[in-house]
Amino acid sequence: MGQPIAIEVRNVSKRYSDDPGLAPALDNVSVNIADNEFFTLLGPSGCGKTTLLRAIAGFEHVSDGEIRLAGETVNHLPPFKRRVNTVFQSYALFPHMSVAQNIAFGLEMQGLDRKTIPGRVDEMLALVQMEHLAGRKPAQLSGGQQQRVALARALAPKPKVLLLDEPLSALDLKLRKEMQVELKRVQQEAGITFIFVTHDQEEALTLSDRIAVMSAGKILQIGTPIDIYERPQHRFVAQFIGDINFLPGQLKRGEHNENIFVPNGMPVEIPCPPQGVNGSSVQLAFRPERSQLVAADQPHHLRGVIEAVLYVGTATLYQCRLNNDIKVMLRENNEGLNRGRAVGEPVAVHLPPQACLLMEA
């Protein structure tokens, strides 16, 4: 990355017990996060993402390793001395205070000149587009409005980094999508680093400049949303980010020294990317939307039968049982030219080479 580094996490581990039989909450985690970056920690419950966020904030002491903020080691510093603020899932607004008073509270605790506080509050109200609601109490606000107030309050003291612990999870789907757009806008306008924790894959792909996918206390892969979705380096990452199918089989060399995948139990040869070793057992992975359903009499394709049809509005999902008894999920966009397909219908599946990923068996 060409930008200056905002946060450095170096070989950080966190253990809650000295019992060697218990896995650590964080296991030798390292990552650099740039200034002004929207960086997401993504993973299932219990993967360590919130523990890492809390360690950066200073709410958790690390067992090993180092956390640096703008080049300074902060392991020994309490949270209030780290120039890092946190937005929690619960928002934690003061119910007896107005919107403006909630935003001003952190500035008052910081000892800011009282003459400058109203101007800073006005800036934050404008940033989150809530000038007209400055006098309301939290109970008079919607969930999305409360989230904006919590965001404004956290940004008001001008932290170096803002940490967000699943702040959208309590909102309904429509409001959550609206707030995703708002959150990205606020981050770009505020011009500071956001570190965002979520288990929602779509949320991570939508918001992030880069994503770290975590499992069992480890970071498995760091990359842009396109890298993570299109080029997963681990089976867990491939399965956790979106839907994906796996076919076991063998690699061999074609006539022109290209890679050819032969699925187990099927006399089909599928051109695939230049990965792997000739003769090695591998898994061919492909996304449902990257495959193409074609007529069953087409040669050189996977063959199978449709077992289930799921209409999802803009697309239809087809669960197919291939002739080697492997089940795969396929997706077709619902366009005017598409004809409906029925359960029991024989089909063939075309996999373009660019749709194929090779992974270890």
From Swiss-Prot:
It catalyses: ATP + H2O + polyamine-[polyamine-binding protein]Side 1 = ADP + phosphate + polyamineSide 2 + [polyamine-binding protein]Side 1. It is found in: Cell inner membrane. SMART domains: AAA (SM00382). InterPro entries: AAA+_ATPase, ABC_SmlMolc_Importer, ABC_transporter-like_ATP-bd, ABC_transporter-like_CS, Mo/tungstate-bd_C_term_dom, P-loop_NTPase, PotA-like, PotA_ATP-bd. Signal peptide: none annotated. Keywords: ATP-binding, Cell inner membrane, Cell membrane, Membrane, Nucleotide-binding, Translocase, Transport. NCBIfam families: potA (TIGR01187). This is Spermidine/putrescine import ATP-binding protein PotA.
